[in-house]
Amino acid sequence: MYDSRGVALHSELIHRWNHAFSILSIVAFPKKRLLFAGSQDSKILVFDLPTYNLIHTIRLGESQEETHTRSSVLCLTGSEDENFLFSGGADSLVRIWSIGEKTIRDDFLPVTEIATVYSVTDIGDIFSLAYLDSLETIVFGCQNASLLYVENLIQKIEKKSSDGVENINKLPHRRYDKFFDSLGPTGYSSNSLSQTSLTSLQENCGAAIIEVPSENIIKYAHYGFIYSINKLCPRFNQLLEKSSRTSGAEHIISSAGDGISKLWEFSKDKGQNTVKISLINDKIDNEDSVISQTIEFPFLYCGLTDGIIKIWDLNTQQIISTLKTKHESDVISISVYMDHVFAIDESGITHFYQNQVNHWNPQQGKILSSEIFSKSNAGSVSLLTGGSDGSLTLWDITSLLSAVPLSSNSPINASSTLQTTNLWAAYQSASLNNEEMLNTLRELISFQTVSQSKDTTNTLSLRRCAIYLQQLFLKFGATNSQLFPLPDGGNPVVFAYFQGNGKVSQVKGAKKKRILWYGHYDVISSGNTFNWNTDPFTLTCENGYLKGRGVSDNKGPLVSAIHSVAYLFQQGELVNDVVFLVEGSEEIGSASLKQVCEKYHDIIGKDIDWILLSNSTWVDQEHPCLNYGLRGVINAQIKVWSDKPDGHSGLNGGVYDEPMVNLVKIVSKLQNEQNEIMIPNFYSPLKDLTEEEYQRFQKITELANIDENTTVQDLITNWTKPSLSMTTVKFSGPGNITVIPKSVTMGISIRLVPEQSVEQVKRDLKAYLEESFKQLKSQNHLEIKVLNEAEGWLGDPTNHAYQILKDEITTAWDVEPLLVREGGSISCLRMLERIFDAPAVQIPCGQSTDNGHLANENLRIKNWSNLTEILSKVFNRL
């Protein structure tokens, strides 16, 4: 079945296997093209993917003939090289098998049980497993809320493979139990469960019997059954603060019935051949039992009761989205691939992607397990599900992932390996050539970082972009890079620090400076893509221009700055310290940036000397510019509403005060017939334009290729005078011309100049409107709401930084830059100056035709590469 876009609504069934008992756990070995399914009747079924045949059955715990459920296989996992299979279950044992290579001729698969791991304490059922390959450590979570682990497992197996007789009677099945092993009515006791079979196992297989050391048992690791354990990519270590990093450490996340998801670190104990465990974080509280979980880094997906799925950012430990299935039942299993979420509950499979929710029932009774994987080199992705009716079904979900590029070069196993593209590459050299920079920009543009959108897809994309930038800084050699979480749970701020390593000038009194580069990774929505000539989120290089959403505002200039600094640093030529502050909420007003800067002030730097940014364009297509002034803004909504419902002009017209009439009357008092703004004290702080500034504006009208009708007075009005615009009107009701709406809302946008106080104008505006409304003596109600605001900014175009930039721009373009101001606003600029007590300098990059917030956003490559060259000089000269 397909939707109106031709995208499949659910997957196609590839194959179905049937078994007499429930399928409780599954794991795929894509490279060996094998599937393993753990069953309720103490078996592990092994299937060959190319032929779909059952080629082997592993029987656990009892004789080869007897069917029983005492060793039900509740969880399975494998090593990354697929040479080892691990199982845990109802018998409190972890079993380990060596998996050989299947012979092509007769489908023979060498499977050898090489070890059994047990605990001397009663741990109950084993619900979850993870194998940490680099540490050869198996970790498992249990019914009694304990977390257990055995390190150096392969070494211990090799050492103890012929020694197990003294330990075999300590296994849970061999211990005397006062209840189960008591004398019955006959007065005789029967043989202990599995006594014969375990002896047979010991004699025939030579499997090692390994006891979990008591010091490796974390009692009450949770306060509930530990249902899930997932391991993190070893390079997750890079995301920790430098002081907290442990070389060679591995990490897991455990989740349990207590609702807490805990981050644990496993690391080699220095000087000893042991592994120690540390609890790193226990702040992720789902406030409900976690039945299942999976990781698609950097996100943790927790399946809860009542069909709830919570998505957490592991970097900031913040919840970023919540999904809900239509059927309010436990999310028994969850699988994720490239933001496609497959949630399993008793009603079937629910697929979430881009605000689309599709559901289908595979008719498997109650589905108990799931996994996403791909056949090696097949280029297709499959979903495997196991049901209570004994069925194991394989679904082709490639059509569901039609918007996602699939790679056939590497197998996918979403439960055991992390889906990360080139995110975790090691140290990378930085270059100032366009090809290297294009690779970085191409990655950045591919992230759909629309901060105005609250849908899950954009939210995840914004977080992925932040992680990408953090890793990019680290790969380029940044001394420190981390994400600063926003207090409201919004998009994190990316921080990076490059410590100057070049020689400081020998001039007397010269010292190293600390420069802050501000940028943002969020973008405006692309709108209707039919208005674009190219895909807005795929970088296109055409006719000397970069095209895509964000190339000009602000990802293109950001890449120029990053590569400039990284190149100097890697060459050992970065004279000054440079810090980057890159936010993800600029397009929605930078609401929490101030709190972040104040909280992390000491990390960012107490002694910032200069603030640089490139967040605007030239005034034309030909003349480079330096910007030294921006207007401020107050965007507000004025709402008038009635207690009465929508009315009819024929029945109710003239009977009572109408909200629309009230609103028109009060907003009409905001300006007089000469378009002067009537808010009290509005013009009082304004200063006259200096002769020097007038001459600058005169020069712009003479040199710049702008509208020939534009006068100096037009520039003065747009750049240095305040204004008030009435921008939107919304009302209740159907919009018919005869309907009197019960509520009406008007949007206004007030542009301020640097001399004006935003707080004072807000107070005066509110008081003026309230007094005007009071004079109407209306029975209706008034509400004034400020949506966002920004202070005006005025730099000093004669200071040291502007002079250096003027020199370098002149060298790069063979023409002096125009000194300009703008009528627009950057909400955080004045705030950054005030918090860090440093002057800001605005360096426009693109041309006036960049279409920053419009369709077909573009940036001339020459402008982009020249900015990079300019910055590589400026960062050292300041």
From Swiss-Prot:
Source superkingdom: Eukaryota
Obligatory cofactor(s): Zn(2+)
Pfam families associated with the record: M20_dimer, Peptidase_M20, WD40
EC number: 3.4.-.-
Cysteine pairings via disulfide bonds: none
The entry's keywords: Cytoplasm, Dipeptidase, Hydrolase, Metal-binding, Metalloprotease, Nucleus, Protease, Repeat, WD repeat, Zinc
GO biological process, one term: proteolysis
Subunit organization: Component of the GSH degradosomal complex composed of at least DUG1, DUG2 and DUG3.
Protein name: Probable di- and tripeptidase DUG2
Species per Swiss-Prot/TrEMBL record: Saccharomyces cerevisiae (strain ATCC 204508 / S288c)
Lineage: Eukaryota, Fungi, Dikarya, Ascomycota, Saccharomycotina
Protein's gene: DUG2
